[in-house]
UniProtKB/Swiss-Prot annotation:
It comes from Legionella pneumophila (strain Paris). This is 1-(5-phosphoribosyl)-5-[(5-phosphoribosylamino)methylideneamino] imidazole-4-carboxamide isomerase. The lineage of its organism: Bacteria, Pseudomonadati, Pseudomonadota, Gammaproteobacteria, Legionellales. The gene is hisA. It is found in: Cytoplasm. Keywords: Amino-acid biosynthesis, Cytoplasm, Histidine biosynthesis, Isomerase. The keyword Amino-acid biosynthesis applies. The active site is at D8, D129.
């Protein structure tokens, strides 16, 4: 299983949100390029970078910074505001390894399919963020500011027909809380769609959580707030 450090960007700085709330932001003193270089030196195989300003505004705002981060030698999957073919091509042509498409996949499937066809499915990660208030996980959009009526399973089934294999799934209630992932959700995901390379995000606290996700068949785990804790040895997590 791939262990992927996450870096959230806001106004050029590293931040973390609690449960996706923009009014609950923690800003860190380390600069994004330094953080990327740190993970590259430790042996990370990929970075997950989110432009929070882009996610909120609908257009990626920090592409130049993200490209500078990738120059540290670590491939990046990046998202936050990729909501047009032009923006997707700009990111791809700038050298971003994989584009993370979120809200657009729910609000504009036709445009999303055009992007998939242009960029190729293997270069796309669909980021599907859910609220599990009922038995059915429903998707949130626009930086988690709004809820949709689409279920996770409906959307995955739809895009599977267009060659999508990489899906990043976050239970919003777990994100930034350090209370553990939603294991039941990921177990269901793998059971329903075993051919999808699932990336789990939200709530991971320690090595045991990672081990459990691996045992469920999850392909990758995204680590955010956990990596800002003083007692975490990232090199050990890679083993």
């Amino acid at each position: 299983m791939l262990v992927i450090p996450a870096i959230d960007l806001q106004s050029g700085r590293c931040v973390r949100l609690k449960q996706g709330r923009f009014d609950q932001v923690t800003q860190f003193s380390v600069f994004p390029i330094e953080r990327a270089l740190h993970f590259a030196k430790l042996g990370a195989k990929r970075l997950h970078v989110v432009d929070l300003d882009g996610a909120r505004s609908g257009k990626m705002q920090q592409l130049e910074l993200i490209c500078s981060m990738q120059k540290t030698g670590i491939p990046i999957q990046a998202g936050g505001g990729i909501r047009s073919i032009e923006q997707a091509l700009e990111c791809s042509n700038a050298g971003i390894s994989q584009l993370v498409i979120g809200s657009l996949a729910i609000t504009n499937p036709d445009l999303t399919i055009q992007i998939i066809e242009k960029i190729k499915p293997e270069n796309i990660v669909l980021a599907l963020d859910v609220r599990v208030d009922t038995k059915v996980p429903l998707l949130a959009i626009n930086g988690w500011q709004n809820n949709s009526t689409s279920s996770l399973w409906e959307v995955v089934s739809y895009y599977e027909n267009y060659g999508i294999k990489n899906i990043l799934c976050t239970d919003i209630a777990c994100d930034g809380m350090m209370n553990g992932p939603n294991f039941d959700l990921y177990q269901q995901a793998v059971e329903y769609f075993p051919q999808i390379a699932w990336q789990a995000s939200g709530g991971v606290r320690h090595m045991q959580d990672i081990t459990t996700l691996n045992s469920l068949g999850i392909s990758a785990v995204i680590l955010g707030l956990m990596l800002y804790q003083d007692n975490v040895n990232f090199e050990e997590l890679l083993c």
